[in-house]
């Protein structure tokens, strides 16, 4: 069983150009099984990477330090390098699970950078997939219930109220991609957002654009891994919070029957396939559209009618609105529907509104986006500091003095144009005023327009796509790779 299990879990591509590998091991059954499975598999490789086991001590329970020490002893017995990293500082009182997840990945990434590792593996299992699906599905059903109540309120009383309520509810659920009769999530080719979420945890992702994150156990049940450990006569640590019903995941776990578990596992697989196909369809659509991004402004020329009616078109519009506005999250399906309803590409007059941090201007020639002027703040980037400004620019100050970052001023823009003899056709100052400006006591720069070496400060600037910068799912890679060149702005001083 051990050999067969290990042979089915890993791909040849998992270890390509990998000299050092970080394994996240807490001491629980899932991660401990991962450790021994990887150890066994690497024996089959001619040039295996070096294993470095990392245990994250979240310091949320008194037992956590002792548990980390137990993992260290296991690694020492098997001659494997081991590191303990700790989540320091004050812990949040709410959303502790999600906050711990972010902290955990940040700590793993930092250790990977420190060790020169290009790959992190974690022990997420099929149980994690199924539980995640069920939690997200239940939230969708709650949203559907809210819609039903809103629809009834809109219809009012009367003999036809129930019929009207059902029709309105079904119509709104149809727009959201949620089944309107308490059934499954509607399987629609254009249900972009909800199938996206129900695809759950991807096998592979890219952490901070540099380190691969692979979860090879996603297709394996937890009990299978525990059987594997028993056969190897290995014991694992039981986390008491796994039985604490104050946590949503525990309640969901305890409610899942074997038959339902199998059914949900199949749905996760189908949703993942659909999400990857949708990503490819969106990538093809973006390539078919006439899109330009320059000087803080994105413009989508009015597409042919069949492209406007493409099921992915609302997603593309929402995507560029978020990216130009510096948002960290893609728009949910309900907001995409609202956004598309606001657009009329048949109007001869220019119309304008703000959405997702962007100004969106449209008429029969197309759609323009730029960062709205509201809530753009100035900041000081100290020497040696890396700072994310406005959700759009990552700035690293390599100089020996602080710099100020903020939006370009109108006076500075006009002066720059005059002194550098710029000839920008159809200059659009509202979008230019959203560009990053860097200044100190020696002067200022607007790096996307000009860079003044005379300022004698050294900086690195990178235009980021915030929803994908921290963690990019392989399921989204198809369209992200197509969008990336539009925002491939790098300045090195």
From Swiss-Prot:
EC number in record: 6.3.4.19
Keyword Nucleotide-binding in record: yes
Gene3D superfamilies: HUPs
Enzymatic reactions: cytidine(34) in tRNA(Ile2) + L-lysine + ATP = lysidine(34) in tRNA(Ile2) + AMP + diphosphate + H(+)
GO CC annotation terms, alphabetical: cytoplasm
InterPro entries linked to this entry: Rossmann-like_a/b/a_fold (IPR014729), TilS/TtcA_N (IPR011063), tRNA_Ile_lys_synt (IPR012094), tRNA_Ile_lys_synt_N (IPR012795)
Record SUPFAM superfamilies: Adenine nucleotide alpha hydrolases-like
GO biological process, one term: tRNA modification
Location of this chain's protein in the cell: Cytoplasm
Amino-acid positions noted as binding ATP in the UniProt annotation, renumbered to this chain: 26-31
EC top class, as a word: ligase
CDD domains recorded: TilS_N
Entry keywords, A to Z: ATP-binding, Cytoplasm, Ligase, Nucleotide-binding, tRNA processing
One MF annotation (Gene Ontology) recorded for this entry: ATP binding
Domain notes: The N-terminal region contains the highly conserved SGGXDS motif, predicted to be a P-loop motif involved in ATP binding.
Similarity field: Belongs to the tRNA(Ile)-lysidine synthase family.
Role noted for this protein: Ligates lysine onto the cytidine present at position 34 of the AUA codon-specific tRNA(Ile) that contains the anticodon CAU, in an ATP-dependent manner. Cytidine is converted to lysidine, thus changing the amino acid specificity of the tRNA from methionine to isoleucine.
Name of the protein this chain belongs to: tRNA(Ile)-lysidine synthase
Species in which this protein is naturally found: Bartonella henselae (strain ATCC 49882 / DSM 28221 / CCUG 30454 / Houston 1) (Rochalimaea henselae)
